[in-house]
């Protein structure tokens, strides 16, 4: 009680239930490992561990109110950021905190620095700076965010701190996708507690209403509360779970040592067949970047963490979740762009799908919703053979899909998309887009290379698809007539595109 007799606003972390306590029914189950896991069943890389779960707390509330050894403040490089977490900490800590911060002379992204807690219940504040997120620099952002969590925990260990209260380090204003950031946060904390956590008794994740659902969904993947939950969670783990410390792994930067140096590696020979929508990569800036998803998956297989069958099952479940969401989400804003639509059939009777590059304002739309819309439209189309016509006509840098988005789309979609795609007609390519496509199909998705046909004029396209079978955006017709001359006196009517 404070001097006025009012109850304290601060919350003692020892009074909060641990993550493990939230699933007592399953924890008390009499099922044994042998009963749940068959002899050839692959165990999760994040095993059920009662002791680790007892150290973790998920709490909805203000991190500044926690009574623990240290709380975490997320800020900017000058430690002057005005976000809800920082403002609450500064208000409760008092003016002495600002004076102390001036002595630190800032903090670089990924670093962690220590000050006293002053008027807070926590003895210390650990300040860190989360990365600004841009999808083209995703790998760097992942590494920086990992460093934030890792350096906070390392500092806590060096200072013999028994309890740490984490805010969500990836602040909304820095643009980091919450779910991606949560994966990094949880796996980093899990690995640290396993390897270095002997002196740390409590780690609290203090979250808001908006963040709680994501943490509730992902915590079972990294902190399963029972053998059953461990088994259920395995298919939902992402392909990249980091190294032994939870640090993001970049396959193309790893030195690979082959058992037989003179022999070709299987994992460089086997590539999935190309996915039609990857033609959207055409014109993307990062054409020389080689993505390593297949390598990541095979790395897990070699480590004995996932079998091929488990990977296929995991992929199918993941796709089904996207499909269910696509069917329930309101995607009218994406549909109104008229960037993807079905038209007629080609000369072989295969369905023709059109992608209009100029109608994709990449910087203005939610790309996750764009992915959902693609799945919503294409799921029933891809069950049989189809072709894609991509109009690159008059696109600008604001219409070029990021390679990371295309990589994500490639990872998500079902195998039928790749198997039944028979041709991609890339209309009105530029020199840059041709080079981009060559690099992408040579190094990343080799199965797509033979399916792409660059088409410089509509006249060339008509040798494969009759003009009556395609709905053309008016600006495509105008551009082609201006550049190549009018080959036809009339074209089929077009929708209002």
Curated annotation (Swiss-Prot):
GO terms for cellular component: lysosomal membrane. Pfam families: CRAL_TRIO_2 (PF13716), Macro (PF01661). Gene3D superfamilies: CRAL-TRIO lipid binding domain, Leucine Aminopeptidase, subunit E, domain 1. Belongs to the GDAP2 family. The modification Phosphoserine is found at residue 280. Residues 252-273 are annotated as: Disordered. This is Ganglioside-induced differentiation-associated protein 2. Residues 253-263 have a biased composition (Basic and acidic residues). Residues 43-223 form the Macro domain. Residues 333-481 form the CRAL-TRIO domain. Keywords: Disease variant, Neurodegeneration, Phosphoprotein, Spinocerebellar ataxia. GO terms for biological process: response to retinoic acid. It is linked to Spinocerebellar ataxia, autosomal recessive, 27: A form of spinocerebellar ataxia, a clinically and genetically heterogeneous group of cerebellar disorders due to degeneration of the cerebellum with variable involvement of the brainstem and spinal cord. SCAR27 is a progressive disease characterized by gait difficulties, eye movement abnormalities, dysarthria, and difficulty writing. Some patients may lose independent ambulation. Additional features include spasticity of the lower limbs and cognitive impairment. InterPro entries: CRAL-TRIO_dom, CRAL-TRIO_dom_sf, Macro_dom, Macro_dom-like, Macro_GDAP2. CDD domains: Macro_GDAP2-like, SEC14.
């Amino acid at each position: 009680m404070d001097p006025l007799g009012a109850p304290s606003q601060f919350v003692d972390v020892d009074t909060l239930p641990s993550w493990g306590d939230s699933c007592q029914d399953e924890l008390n189950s009499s099922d044994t490992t042998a009963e749940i896991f068959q002899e050839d069943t692959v165990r999760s890389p994040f095993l059920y561990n009662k002791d680790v779960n007892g150290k973790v707390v998920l709490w909805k509330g203000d991190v500044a109110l926690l009574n623990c050894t240290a709380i975490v403040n997320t800020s900017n490089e000058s430690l002057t950021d005005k976000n809800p977490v920082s403002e609450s900490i500064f208000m409760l800590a008092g003016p002495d905190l600002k004076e102390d911060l001036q002595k630190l002379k800032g903090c670089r992204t990924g670093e962690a620095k220590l000050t006293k807690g002053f008027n807070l219940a926590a003895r210390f504040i650990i300040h860190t700076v989360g990365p600004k997120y841009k999808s083209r620099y995703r790998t760097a952002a992942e590494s920086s965010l990992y460093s934030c969590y890792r350096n906070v925990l390392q500092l806590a260990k060096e200072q013999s701190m028994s309890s740490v209260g984490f805010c969500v380090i990836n602040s909304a204003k820095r643009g980091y996708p919450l779910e991606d950031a949560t994966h990094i946060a949880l796996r980093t904390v899990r690995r640290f507690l396993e390897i270095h956590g002997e002196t740390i008794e409590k780690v609290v994740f203090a979250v808001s209403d908006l963040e709680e659902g994501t943490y509730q969904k992902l915590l079972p993947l990294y902190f399963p509360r029972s053998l059953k939950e461990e088994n259920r969670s395995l298919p939902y783990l992402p392909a990249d779970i980091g190294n032994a410390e939870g640090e993001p792994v970049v396959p193309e930067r790893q030195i690979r040592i082959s058992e037989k140096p003179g022999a070709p590696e299987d994992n460089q020979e086997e590539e999935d067949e190309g996915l039609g929508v990857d033609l959207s990569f055409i014109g993307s800036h990062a054409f020389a970047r080689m993505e390593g998803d297949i390598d990541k998956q095979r790395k897990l297989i070699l480590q004995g963490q996932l079998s091929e069958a488990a990977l296929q099952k995991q992929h199918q479940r993941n796709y089904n979740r996207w499909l269910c969401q696509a069917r329930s989400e309101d995607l009218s804003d994406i549909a109104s762009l008229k960037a993807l639509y079905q038209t007629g059939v080609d000369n072989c009777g295969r369905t023709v799908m059109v992608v209009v590059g100029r109608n994709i304002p990449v910087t203005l739309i939610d790309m996750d919703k764009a992915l959902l819309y693609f799945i919503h439209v294409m799921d029933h189309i891809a069950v049989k053979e189809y072709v894609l016509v991509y109009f690159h006509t008059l696109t600008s840098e604001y219409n070029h899909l990021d390679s990371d988005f295309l990589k994500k789309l490639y990872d998500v979609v079902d195998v039928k998309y790749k198997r039944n795609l028979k041709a991609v007609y890339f209309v009105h390519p530029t020199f840059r887009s041709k080079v981009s496509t060559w690099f992408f199909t040579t190094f990343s998705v080799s199965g797509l290379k033979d399916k792409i046909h660059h088409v410089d004029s509509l006249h060339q396209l008509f040798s494969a698809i009759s003009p009556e079978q395609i709905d053309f955006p008016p600006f495509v017709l105008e551009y082609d007539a201006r550049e190549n001359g009018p080959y036809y006196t009339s074209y089929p009517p077009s929708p209002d595109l």
